[in-house]
Amino acid sequence: MALTLRVCSTFLRSCSSNSKSVLSGLSSVRFRSSCPVLISHLDHLVLTVRDLNKTTKFYSEVLGMEVVTFKGDRKALSFGEQKINLHQVGKEFEPKAQTPTPGSADLCLITKTPLKAVADHLKACGVTIEEGPVDRTGAVGPISSLYFRDPDDNLIEVSNYQQ
């Protein structure tokens, strides 16, 4: 790996007059890990929230997620092949994050719905758009994004992959 990086670095330096144009064409650089553990996808994450009812209403009405009740009265938000488990602050399930805090998340959600339609729907739901649409870099390529907040002030980014 060190040799590969050294060769790449030497190549870029040798293209000194060209290096800015070479680098400007790169949207991101990925390095392969030698770790034997390969993660395939995210199954679920946990949001700590102040009010389960406000949160489930927001995510179901504004973002179309399905509210799921499991293991008695636990709540989750289901979409695609993922879910967001909800923990009410002060009533978290073990094990839990070291400092579970409402409003500390920053989530990027991908949709195929055009962002204009998303923006119109957000406005109709009384949700304030903080920014966007703006161009960003997603996990698998360029995206266009809208930013807004959920009832706990988590930052929510809804994005389309650019063609």
From Swiss-Prot:
Residues 41-161 form the VOC domain. Pfam families: Glyoxalase (PF00903). InterPro entries: Glyas_Bleomycin-R_OHBP_Dase (IPR029068), Glyas_Fos-R_dOase_dom (IPR004360), GlyoxalaseI/FosfomycinResist (IPR050383), VOC (IPR037523). Transmembrane segments: none annotated. It comes from the Eukaryota. Belongs to the glyoxalase I family. PANTHER family: GLYOXALASE DOMAIN-CONTAINING PROTEIN 5 (PTHR21366:SF14), GLYOXALASE FAMILY PROTEIN (PTHR21366). This is Glyoxalase domain-containing protein 5. The gene is glod5.
